[in-house]
Amino acid sequence: MKRFDVWLIMKNPEYGRVVDNLGLCTIITPNELNSLPSLLVAPMTTSIEKIPSRVECIFEGANGFIMIDQIRTIDKFSFIKKLGELENDVQINLCDRFQEFFAY
């Protein structure tokens, strides 16, 4: 598990494994902290319009968004399957957007 990997996760594991409970996310935790039992992730979606707190991406041929306004911490047991990694240009754009989002 490393930064910018895209994973299928269980959103709410306490409610069981149902299809509606699954989602895509990208890991945003710096690799130096990935030994911890939980990771910081940003959910991914194909169904939300473009707004400033969303980063556009194409993953597995689908246009979508990374929702940096919906970041959350997920226990590692909620990670089901690694699906790939974000393209380099999306990684750069995501980091730039985080700097803007959390600017003081």
Regions found by a protein language model. Give the residues of each.
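Conserved functional hotspots at enzyme active or ligand-binding sites that engage polyanionic ligands
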Residues: M1-Y104
